[in-house]
């Protein structure tokens, strides 16, 4: 589903395309058979018919030499506008008819469809609602040629915000939309009686949700891109959902994690199309806008139930654990709940069932175990970080940061692109701007306190953003859009504050003054290094700024690319330096957001031989660069996404064989079975594709090649996801094997050998080996092994770092 994209790239001349180029004398001479009557002393004429030299004609009122008041304009290609004019542009109530058969009836302003109006295209797609500058904007009601209907909020030509989409087959979605797709919180109800309420992303179930079948069974858990992913609970038909679970679901609705049906119904009822008054007694519109109006997009909300195969399997498996013949009554009778029917606690990995625990339906209201379980589920459902909202300690700081970045990018983007010069580097290549709360001639009013904004080397960072193909508008929307940032707890000892953009593309970190000086000093060499080595694994920097509130300390920020921006779930995160002193996580409870360290790593990762050689070569180049800059204390940030282990894939095969008969009664997408069966082969590499390939937002360089497909460039194909582009440090498939003797280091979620996808890069590259670090080295060497501490000179640090990384990625003798 998508709205018509009528982006009016209409010039002023096109919007006034009529008789404004003719003088009054020429108008009179053009009237071969028409008539002109003087209607007032202000030179207003009433033209019966004026034939222009190019074959187009106008009849109506003129003021001077432009249309003013009611008039009709006919273009040479058959397009007709009949309605009100002002200063030569369509303005007021009017009707426009295209040669293709499309028409618009409604309000115009300044030559654009603007206000309330009804548009019908040549294929009988009908939209009735609000317009803004030729785009659907506001409340609107659209009927598609196939009978689908969407009513709700539109922004810039696309469904955005609360709305209701009804398919021709009577399936209904009620909830949030974004970019014309189901995104946010919403409920989809099928005509069969099944329903899903929860979070959506790009038209797919994504996040916490509840899937309920028509027979009363339900699954409460998390999804990733349409597939179950993580822990959840399955309640078969006839099972009463525990009171604690009901409290948990209600709490999620209050917090906005699940959709609030009462609120959605209120929103839906408020979208009353009868209240959208559209004037139809006059006809109007401009030709320049019409051409773009024809270019409608055919994208629509996808209703393919790509999860329904596993749903059917789940039904049968769940029924297999208990005699449901005693729980399911004859049709038409009320449901009876059986306390002895078990509840299935399950864990999935990207749609694959990896563990299952049968528990008795005997939760009490005051069960401590149940409360702990649901408190843990709520914690797992949350995104990493703390949402910065009004009242948060960092709220004013976030507002100032967003306002400053918006100002900086808006100021520098119009400047013509050019090569970076020597004068663009250094502390002097910066500018100040004061942002008073009430606003100024240069800055808008805002809700934060007065502050001063300093932007360092804006031309250099603009060049870096362009180098990584980051669009200026996307950059601003990601950091400074309507969504707030999330504050992350500092994983290290620096005490830095970390912000994460809501779309997870960018990290923002506070820096010490000394770190800013280091970055400015090394920025020319950093820029040259990144430009020369497009596969570099060093942190990508996109902006350096400083905020000085009117009352308070200075804050210095650097904007970086998030190395873990991916649709795949990062199950483990490691910060690896090669040292051993104090290099283990001190958290008792380890979750997916815990940053583990060198001594916590109990797996080796085996890559294809050529990939390993390329990775180690690039790491050596990068570490030598940092050594030349007198930098130490950096680390390799490693993210691990793991797939289902081999021995569990056979369980899926057995489950599918059990459910052969049951699947016949469910309408499925035939491709799903093939997708799920592909797990048996582990990670699948396919020759590179030109379409539907997901790339990272900050990726440069060539793709990796695989000997298995004739040394061609390859993509990674995973069930339930798009093709992932494999590059150095991004979407790298590997085999993880347990290191002997390290089995009990942490609770194992991986197995002895399993498939993984790796994400990695070098971070924390702003620590010089200065006098402070030299003193730290001397002091710690008196108490500990000098080779085990982090504070060592850059040359030794680089050597030790590379030796350790070689052990993490040993030579693959099986490839």
From Swiss-Prot:
GO biological processes: amino acid metabolic process; carbohydrate metabolic process; phosphatidylinositol metabolic process
Induction of synthesis: Transiently down-regulated by cold.
Tissue specificity of this protein: Widely expressed.
PROSITE patterns, A to Z: PIPK
Subcellular localization, as worded in the UniProt entry: Membrane; Nucleus
Topology with respect to the bilayer: Peripheral membrane protein
Reactions it catalyzes: a 1,2-diacyl-sn-glycero-3-phospho-(1D-myo-inositol 4-phosphate) + ATP = a 1,2-diacyl-sn-glycero-3-phospho-(1D-myo-inositol-4,5-bisphosphate) + ADP + H(+)
SMART domains the record matches: MORN (SM00698), PIPKc (SM00330)
Alphabetic keyword roster: ATP-binding, Kinase, Membrane, Nucleotide-binding, Nucleus, Repeat, Transferase
Region of interest (Activation loop), residue spans: 769-790
CDD domains linked to this entry: PIPKc_AtPIP5K_like (cd17302)
Function according to Swiss-Prot or TrEMBL: Plays a role in sugar-mediated root development. Interaction with CINV1 induces repression of CINV1 activity and negative regulation of sugar-mediated root cell elongation.
Miscellaneous field: The gain-of-function mutant pip5k9-d (T-DNA insertion line) has reduced primary root length.
Name this polypeptide is given: Phosphatidylinositol 4-phosphate 5-kinase 9
Species of the source: Arabidopsis thaliana (Mouse-ear cress)
Gene: PIP5K9
């Amino acid at each position: 589903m998508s709205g018509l994209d009528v982006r009016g790239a209409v010039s002023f001349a096109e919007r006034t395309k009529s008789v404004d180029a003719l003088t009054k004398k020429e108008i009179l001479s053009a009237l071969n058979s028409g008539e002109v009557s003087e209607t007032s002393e202000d030179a207003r004429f009433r033209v019966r018919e004026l034939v222009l030299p190019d074959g187009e004609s106008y009849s109506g009122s003129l003021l001077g030499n432009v249309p003013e008041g009611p008039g009709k304009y006919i273009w040479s290609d058959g397009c007709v506008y009949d309605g009100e004019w002002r200063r030569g542009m369509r303005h007021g109530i009017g009707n426009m008819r295209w040669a293709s058969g499309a028409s618009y009836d409604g309000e115009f302003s300044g030559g654009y469809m603007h206000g309330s109006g009804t548009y019908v295209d040549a294929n009988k797609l009908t939209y009735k609602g609000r317009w803004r500058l030729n785009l659907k904007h506001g409340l609107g009601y659209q009927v598609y040629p196939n009978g689908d209907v969407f009513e709700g909020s539109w922004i810039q030509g696309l469904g955005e915000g609360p709305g209701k989409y009804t398919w021709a087959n009577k399936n209904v979605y009620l909830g949030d939309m974004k970019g014309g797709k189901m995104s946010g919180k919403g409920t989809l109800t099928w005509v069969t009686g099944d329903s899903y309420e929860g979070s959506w992303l790009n038209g797919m179930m994504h996040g916490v949700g509840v899937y309920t079948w028509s027979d009363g069974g339900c699954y409460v858990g998390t999804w990733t891109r349409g597939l179950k992913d993580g822990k959840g609970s399955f309640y078969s038909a006839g099972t009463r959902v525990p009171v604690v679970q009901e409290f948990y679901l209600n709490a999620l609705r209050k917090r906005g994690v699940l959709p609030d049906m009462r609120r959605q119904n209120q929103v839906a009822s408020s979208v009353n199309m009868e209240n959208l008054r559209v004037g139809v007694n006059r006809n109007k519109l401009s030709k320049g806008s019409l051409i773009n109006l024809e270019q409608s997009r055919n994208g629509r909300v996808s209703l393919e139930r790509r999860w329904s195969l596993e749903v059917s399997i789940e039904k049968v498996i769940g029924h297999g654990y208990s005699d449901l013949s005693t729980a399911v009554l004859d049709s038409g009778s009320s449901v009876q709940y059986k306390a002895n029917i078990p509840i299935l606690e399950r864990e999935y990995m990207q749609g694959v069932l990896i563990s299952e625990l049968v528990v008795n339906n005997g939760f009490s209201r005051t069960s401590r175990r149940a409360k702990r379980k649901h408190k843990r589920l709520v914690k797992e459902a949350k995104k990493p970080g703390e949402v910065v909202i009004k009242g948060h300690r960092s709220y004013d700081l976030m507002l100032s940061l967003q306002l400053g970045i918006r100002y900086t990018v808006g100021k520098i983007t119009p400047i013509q692109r050019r090569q970076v010069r020597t004068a663009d580097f250094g502390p002097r290549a910066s500018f100040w701007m004061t942002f008073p709360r009430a606003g100024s001639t240069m800055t808008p009013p805002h809700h934060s306190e007065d502050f001063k904004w300093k932007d360092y080397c804006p031309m250099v960072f603009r060049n870096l953003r362009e180098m990584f193909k980051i669009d200026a508008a996307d950059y601003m929307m990601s950091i400074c859009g309507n969504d707030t940032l999330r504050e992350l707890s500092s994983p290290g000892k620096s005490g830095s504050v970390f912000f994460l953009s809501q779309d997870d593309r960018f990290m923002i970190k506070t820096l010490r003054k000394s770190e800013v000086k280091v970055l400015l000093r090394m920025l020319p060499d950093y820029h040259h290094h990144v430009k020369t080595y497009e596969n570099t694994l060093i942190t990508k920097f996109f902006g350096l700024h400083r905020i000085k509130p009117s009352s308070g300390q200075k804050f210095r920020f650097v904007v970086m690319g998030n190395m873990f921006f991916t649709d795949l779930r990062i199950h483990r995160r490691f910060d690896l330096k090669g040292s051993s002193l104090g290099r283990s996580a001190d958290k008792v409870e380890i979750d997916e957001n815990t940053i583990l360290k060198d001594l916590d790593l109990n797996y080796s990762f085996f890559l294809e031989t050529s990939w390993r050689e390329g990775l180690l070569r690039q790491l050596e180049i990068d570490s030598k660069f940092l050594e030349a800059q007198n930098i130490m204390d950096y680390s390799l940030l490693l993210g691990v996404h793991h797939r289902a282990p081999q021995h569990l894939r056979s369980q899926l095969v057995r489950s599918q064989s059990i459910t052969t008969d049951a699947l016949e009664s469910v309408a499925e997408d035939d491709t799903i079975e093939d997708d799920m069966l592909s797990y048996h082969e582990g990670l699948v590499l396919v020759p590179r594709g030109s379409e539907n390939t997901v790339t990272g937002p900050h990726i440069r360089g060539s793709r990796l090649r695989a000997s298995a497909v004739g040394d061609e460039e390859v993509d990674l194909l995973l069930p339930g996801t798009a093709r992932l582009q494999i590059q150095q440090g991004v979407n790298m498939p590997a085999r993880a094997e347990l290191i002997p003797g390290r089995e009990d280091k942490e609770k194992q979620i991986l197995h002895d050998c399993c498939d993984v996808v790796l994400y990695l890069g070098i971070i924390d590259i702003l620590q010089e080996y200065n006098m402070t670090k030299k003193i730290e080295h001397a002091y710690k060497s008196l108490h500990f092994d000098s080779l085990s501490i982090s504070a060592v000179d850059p040359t030794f640090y680089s050597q030790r770092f590379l030796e350790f990384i070689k052990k993490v990625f040993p030579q693959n003798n099986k490839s």
